[in-house]
């Protein structure tokens, strides 16, 4: 809590959770049934979130962590964002440029892994006519391309990076 001119204001900190972090901290336990991730979740003033792709990836690699994550999402302890929800949020600040903005953020995220990653996997988004494409058609194309990316190609990390970039942009625009 922070006091500003006699008023109490809550300062929130945001923690973006990814597949590796959840999986590894869930696997670390004390002598009982207490997981390290549960201790992390007790950190005060934190808001935890992840991209929905993380749920998909955890289901591939870990038996218990997906159940734990689903319970936390259901209890609203962790917010899981889909691409559709991200685009809806972007629409509030970017209007008709929401899809183009998402594509720019996706390209930045892909560039972290390889300068060719975006052109290899998401070329169709770069060539899209953003003055004509609907959000629904954009999401269908994005989903199709994500499926083509497939397993073991850093999709969870890329989606997390996009969510982080867009979250930073939205926070700057609102504050």
Annotate each PLM feature.
Residues 2-169:
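Active-site-proximal, substrate-binding regions of enzyme catalytic domains
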Residues 174-175:
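A two-mode feature
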